[in-house]
């Protein structure tokens, strides 16, 4: 197909859809962009503008100490529209990239509407159109389109709210306290953190006192018995958690040879074993309080939480079951999925997957092969995780350093600490992404200036 004839459809003009449309148009591909607002509003949006931020106004921490800082740098290097609009509408926020909400959305809307290759079609899309396209309809996907997606992918692969537990970096788990084992000597697929009675009561008291996130009126969360937040279980009584997800049955503590008073278990989240989630600890607690509670679990006293637990209305696919790392639907490779619907968490992550989906859709429309960024890059690490994570209980993921390969440790040398390691990971990832974008993807690249290391850490 010639460039003049190449065309794609994008559904949704949020951060992911707007970025996808502009990325494809920059490659000379015509785009038909569908957005149901303002004709049909969602409970969360105030305007009909594109890329409207409905919660926070921050796109995450900047600098080479931050995983989001690397993703920002990768997107800047290829002219990402969302991070460009954010840079132009930023407000003072320390080491974070925060924006003026209205100016940011107005800039994105202007860029989309002014582009000669983008046609904006206002109105609801009730079924995925034929041909090459990007689906980026976000957490409040309309009922009709959600039903069509469920039909295409299998209804059990489409979720309508988050119920996520905290995810811990393996290297921060104290394995002198915790141990690997399954119940009753089954395969050692879990990491177990044992409590004495005194430790459990301290943990329970902190759990009782922890502050809960207040849901938006439009979220209308209904908790199911099999997915009850840990704080809701605690409201039923001091022993409820330890007779539920924290049961010690069948787990002999190698230090004592006996079952502990209670146990917190962690399950492997990724193939490399870098990330482990707390089993049965789905929670809506405020993040600061989550950290306090998690650090009271024996073996997790210095735990690095790479993704906090959340409980909120959402619509997303079980990405490992339905998506490739190119963000193509396995059942229909002409369709790409981006943003929250693809299983990402966060504004920046939505924009980044929108950029890749739009770029790959444009490549496919031009007769080229869709690509995946290198694993050392943050975007490459994220999409590889989406395609290969444990599908059992899959929950949306934000970027973090556990998504990229560890640095090799030369023989006879010590392992680098966090503050030494992250700038090296940052530069390695950015170099790999820039080389990939220029040499493999054939894109114009402007490597951003080396950032000043931010003081804040993740």
Curated annotation (Swiss-Prot):
Q: Name one GO cellular component term.
A: cytosol
Which Pfam family, an example, fits this chain? GIDA
Q: Which GO terms describe its molecular function?
A: flavin adenine dinucleotide binding; tRNA (uracil(54)-C5)-methyltransferase activity, 5,10-methylenetetrahydrofolate-dependent
- EC code: 2.1.1.74
Q: Name one GO biological process term.
A: tRNA wobble uridine modification
Sites where the protein binds FAD? 12-17
Q: According to its UniProt record, where is this protein located? A: Cytoplasm
Keyword annotations = Cytoplasm, FAD, Flavoprotein, Methyltransferase, NAD, NADP, Transferase, tRNA processing
Q: Look up the record and name the cofactor or cofactors this protein needs.
A: FAD
EC class of the enzyme, as a word: transferase
User: What SUPFAM superfamilies does the annotation carry?
Assistant: FAD/NAD(P)-binding domain
Its biological function? Catalyzes the folate-dependent formation of 5-methyl-uridine at position 54 (M-5-U54) in all tRNAs.
UniProt-recorded name of the protein: Methylenetetrahydrofolate--tRNA-(uracil-5-)-methyltransferase TrmFO
Q: Which organism is it from?
A: Deinococcus geothermalis (strain DSM 11300 / CIP 105573 / AG-3a)
What is the gene name? trmFO
């Amino acid at each position: 197909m010639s460039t003049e004839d190449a065309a794609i459809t994008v559904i949704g003009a949020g951060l992911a859809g707007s970025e996808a449309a502009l990325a494809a148009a920059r490659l000379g591909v015509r785009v038909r962009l569908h957005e149901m607002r303002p004709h049909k509003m969602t409970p969360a949006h105030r305007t009909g503008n594109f890329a409207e931020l409905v919660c926070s106004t921050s796109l995450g921490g900047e600098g080479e100490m931050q995983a989001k800082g690397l993703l920002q740098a990768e997107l800047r290097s290829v002219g990402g529209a969302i991070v460009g609009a954010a840079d132009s509408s930023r407000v003072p926020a320390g080491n974070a990239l925060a924006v003026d909400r209205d100016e940011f959305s107005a800039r994105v809307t202007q860029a989309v509407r002014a582009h000669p290759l983008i046609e904006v079609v206002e109105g609801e899309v009730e079924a995925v159109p034929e041909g090459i396209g990007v689906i980026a309809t976000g957490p409040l996907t309309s009922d009709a389109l959600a039903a069509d997606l469920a039909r295409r992918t299998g209804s059990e692969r489409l979720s309508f709210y988050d119920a996520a537990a905290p995810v811990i970096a393996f290297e921060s788990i104290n394995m002198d306290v915790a141990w690997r084992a399954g119940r009753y000597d089954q395969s050692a697929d879990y990491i177990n953190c044992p409590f004495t009675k005194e430790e459990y009561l301290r943990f329970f008291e902190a759990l009782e006192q922890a502050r809960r996130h207040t849901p938006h009126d439009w979220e209308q969360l209904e908790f199911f018995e099999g997915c009850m937040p840990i704080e809701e279980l605690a409201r039923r009584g001091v022993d409820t958690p330890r007779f539920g997800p924290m049961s010690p049955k069948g787990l002999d503590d190698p230090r004592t040879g006996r079952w502990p008073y209670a146990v917190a278990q962690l399950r492997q989240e990724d193939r490399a074993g870098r990330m482990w989630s707390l089993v049965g600890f789905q929670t809506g607690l405020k993040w600061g309080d989550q950290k306090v509670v998690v650090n009271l679990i024996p073996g997790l006293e210095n735990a690095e939480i790479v993704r906090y637990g959340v409980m909120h209305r959402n619509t997303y696919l079980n990405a490992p079951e339905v998506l490739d790392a190119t963000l193509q639907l396995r059942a229909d490779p002409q369709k790409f999925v981006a943003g929250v619907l693809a299983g990402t968490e966060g504004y920046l992550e939505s924009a980044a997957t929108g950029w890749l989906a739009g770029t790959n859709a444009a490549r496919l429309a031009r007769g080229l092969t869709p690509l995946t960024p290198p694993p050392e890059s943050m975007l490459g690490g994220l999409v590889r995780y989406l395609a290969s994570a444990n599908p059992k209980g899959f929950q949306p993921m934000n970027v973090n350093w556990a998504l990229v390969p560890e640095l090799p440790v030369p023989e006879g040398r010590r392992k680098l600490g966090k503050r030494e390691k992250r700038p090296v990971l940052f530069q390695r990832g950015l170099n790999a992404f820039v080389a990939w974008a220029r040499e493999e993807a054939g894109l114009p690249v402007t490597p951003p200036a080396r950032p000043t290391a931010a003081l804040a850490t993740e």
